[in-house]
Regions:
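Hydrophobic membrane-insertion alpha-helices, especially the h-region
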Residues: 23-38
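Structural motif
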Residues: 135, 141-152
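TPR alpha-solenoid repeat register
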Residues: 327, 517, 549-551
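Accessory beta->alpha helical hairpin/"wing" motif in late/C-terminal subdomains of nucleic-acid enzymes
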Residues: 408-411
Length: 557
């Protein structure tokens, strides 16, 4: 045997040994983790984190929202949930099942009873009375596309007909975003999905519990120290992650056989000043002093209603540093007061995009929504940003459409629902081959059916007033104007309790199975008739066995 043939026989042995070592290094820890995971499950340590768990609704089988689903995405004590929902296991023939995906704006915050999905539901019921529609809103506070995707994945088996995606506001501040306080931030898609999987296991839950302290949810003020400039390289990864998640969510939805509507996100431009601003990095001390003097003089002129003169000084300041979000907002406001609405809108949008507390979907997020929707067959686009802008005489979304930064008013929710309704009506017409009357119920008709009373308008305005008394809203340059607008609505015109009750009773008579109507009526009645309130709240029970309480904590079911 020659040397060359001997080397060929001997050489594979070290390679096999290395392969064995590598395989052992991988498989043994995995096996140990598997044993630990199985042991924890057998010992009932931890909780399931699937989106849906079995339940019954009035004795009929259903899948209900799992209150532990969001735990992998939030620190202990800060878990946020959607408006609770249950999906019937038996889908009746002819039923059209719609799932709404998104964050708090999609959910309908500040009150899901009057979110766009509720308007959509009554529109469909009124115009297509012979069909049954199920509109399930899965939107939730503080989540983003990293959470929306697993929600869609687990809803895909529930025989959906349509997914409506209204998402993009929380890509920076939500889980795994560069400005978040909820999880590790700014990770790649593989790292994010691995983290979600590990945190969902019983082993991951135990390690997370041991390694973290329980925290209290404090809303938007928790993020004050998490400013992310538009120029940050982290934004590039944020946009890439959002697009990847959006495409994957659409793919999951389409694979289920459902149609998909993607909506752009409407944000308040005109009446929501930036939450925080930052100067460009390379600004010299001399340039900063010059900028501050121009800014100071411009503010004095603006306060004196000398908008043209103020605009000149603001423009000079922007030539020194054009990255300061508040300056862009002042330029926009001056242009608006000079009736140059087109230019004003551009600067309002840039002020939003430069805001370093990134609670609003920026121009790039909406560009991704448009691009992705138009690039995939059978996906429809509802350009809410454009549609709601066009509803304003000046073409700029303000507080009549969006309460504060992103949450839609009744008018905003109605306009968004109307566009989604028209898409669905067109689809139903094409499927049946018939001419279907797609006239949209008026906003007033919808609000009668939803029992949006003067009492509720005032109640919601008071809730928004309370929110705006905390940072970061108190840091906005137009904070006092925002408070005045909401205070005026909160005072409102007087409505007697009897009138309010009659409006609820009329709506419930039209839709006796509407749990949301019963819930809101019960909450209203609590101040007048505890027994009647308990009865109504009991009828709003999301599924059998779920505890129902009065506002004072008394359990009624």
């Amino acid at each position: 045997m020659n040397v060359e043939s001997l080397e060929k026989e001997v050489a594979p042995a070290p390679r096999r040994r290395w392969l064995l070592i590598i395989a052992t290094a991988i498989l043994v820890p995995l096996a140990i983790l598997g044993i630990v995971e199985a042991s924890l499950r057998m010992a009932s340590v931890g909780y399931p984190t699937e989106l849906l768990v079995p339940c019954t609704v009035q004795g009929s089988p259903a899948s209900c929202y799992n209150l532990f689903f969001a735990a992998p995405f939030f620190p202990a004590g800060m878990v946020q949930t959607p408006r609770l929902y249950a999906i019937p296991s038996q889908k009746a023939p002819g039923t059209y099942r719609i799932f709404v995906l998104g964050e708090s704006a999609a959910m309908g915050d500040p009150d899901p009873a009057y979110g766009f999905s509720r308007y959509l539901e009554v529109m469909l019921r009124e115009r297509f009375p012979s069909r049954k529609f199920e509109v399930v809103n899965t939107g939730s506070v503080a989540i983003n596309s990293h959470v929306v995707l697993p929600i869609a994945e687990q809803l895909a088996s529930q025989r959906p007909d349509l997914f409506v995606i209204y998402s993009g506001n929380n890509e920076v501040v939500g889980p795994y975003g560069p400005g978040t306080v909820l999880t590790a931030g700014s990770m790649s898609i593989p790292a994010v999905r691995s983290s979600i999987y590990l945190r969902s296991t019983r082993t991951g839950q135990l390690l997370t519990k041991l390694g973290t302290q329980k925290k209290e949810w404090r809303g938007m003020q928790m993020f004050l120290d998490k400013q992310v400039p538009a120029s940050s390289p982290l934004m590039k990864h944020t946009y890439a992650n959002f697009e990847r998640n959006l495409r994957d969510t659409i793919a999951v939805a389409r694979a289920s056989g459902a149609r998909v509507i993607v909506a752009t996100v409407a944000t308040n431009l005109k009446d929501c000043a930036p939450f925080a601003s930052a100067h460009r990095d390379n600004l010299t001390e001399n340039d900063l002093r010059s900028w501050e003097e121009l800014d100071r003089q411009g503010k004095e002129l603006e306060a004196a209603d000398s908008y043209a003169e103020a605009l000149k000084l603001y423009t000079f300041a922007a030539a020194i540093d054009g990255d300061y979000a508040e300056l862009e907002f002042r330029i926009a406001r001056s242009l608006w007061n000079l009736s140059d609405y087109k230019a004003a809108k551009q600067h309002f949008a840039r002020a939003r995009d430069l805001d370093t507390l990134r609670f609003r979907a920026d121009s790039k997020i909406n560009e991704i929504n448009r691009t992705v929707a138009s690039s995939i067959p059978e996906v429809a686009l509802v350009d809410a940003d454009e549609i709601l802008s066009n509803a304003r005489p000046d073409g700029i979304i303000g507080s009549d459409i969006v309460y504060e930064h992103v949450h839609l008013t009744p008018e905003g929710n109605y306009l968004l629902a109307r566009e989604v309704f028209l898409q669905i009506a067109g689809q139903l017409a094409s499927q049946s081959g018939e001419s279907i009357d797609s006239e949209v119920p008026s906003q007033a008709d919808c609000e009668r059916l939803l029992a949006l009373t003067q009492y509720d308008r005032s109640r919601i305005a008071k809730e928004m007033l309370n929110r705006l008394q905390k940072p970061p809203f108190t840091n906005q340059l137009n904070h006092s104007q925002q408070m005045l607008r909401l205070a005026t609505t909160a005072e409102g015109s007087y409505e007697s309790p009897n009138d309010t009750a009659l409006q609820y009773q009329w709506a419930i008579a039209r839709m006796p199975d509407d749990k949301m109507l019963h819930y809101r009526y019960g909450m209203f009645l609590f101040g007048y008739n505890r027994a009647a309130a308990a009865q109504q709240l009991g009828m709003a029970q999301p599924w059998d066995g779920f505890p129902v309480f009065l506002p004072d904590g008394t359990q009624v079911r």
